[in-house]
């Protein structure tokens, strides 16, 4: 969960880009691949689209909710602030919340298929 207007979110984006570049398309012991799904809690579609382009967010799964923190999906996941990152397993288990780049990278590397 992020927003184009959120400075800490924009600061995190280069790390997400690195994770996408490193793990996209790779097989894991317990998952077919790794996907990033970006949910933006936004005010203006133009700013959201511009931030995706400027930050180089090349993964295909982007969603914007213009109700921001009042959105159904933010409430469903208990988002109280952004950025908020969830690591969700293929069976829907939340394996991590707001993991650091280093911890997330370690978690993924440990699960790569040989």
Model-derived regions: residue spans:
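Thiol-based oxidoreductase modules, predominantly thioredoxin-like and allied folds used
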Residues: 28-46, 57-69
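Short, internal strand/loop/helix patches
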Residues: 49-83, 90
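Long, His/Glu/Asp-enriched segments that create or flank divalent metal/ion-associated functional microenvironments
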Residues: 2, 44-46, 50
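Catalytic core segments in nucleotide and nucleic-acid processing enzymes
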Residues: 11-16, 64, 70-73, 99
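Conserved helix-turn-beta segment immediately C-terminal to the redox Cys motif
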Residues: 11-39, 110-111
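Thiol-/selenol-based redox modules, centered on thioredoxin-like
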Residues: 82, 87-114
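Short active-site neighborhood of thiol/selenol oxidoreductases, capturing the structured segment around
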Residues: 1-10, 16
């Amino acid at each position: 969960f992020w927003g184009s207007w959120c400075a800490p979110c924009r600061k995190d984006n280069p790390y997400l880009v690195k994770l996408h570049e490193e793990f996209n398309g790779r097989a894991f012991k317990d998952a077919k691949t790794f996907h990033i799904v970006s949910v933006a809690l936004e005010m203006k579609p133009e700013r959201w689209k511009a931030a995706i382009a400027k930050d180089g967010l090349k993964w295909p799964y982007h969603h914007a909710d213009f109700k921001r923190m009042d959105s159904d999906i933010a409430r469903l996941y208990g988002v109280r602030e952004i950025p908020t990152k969830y690591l969700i397993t293929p069976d829907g288990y939340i394996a991590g919340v707001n993991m650091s780049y280093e911890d997330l990278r370690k978690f993924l590397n440990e699960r790569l298929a040989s």
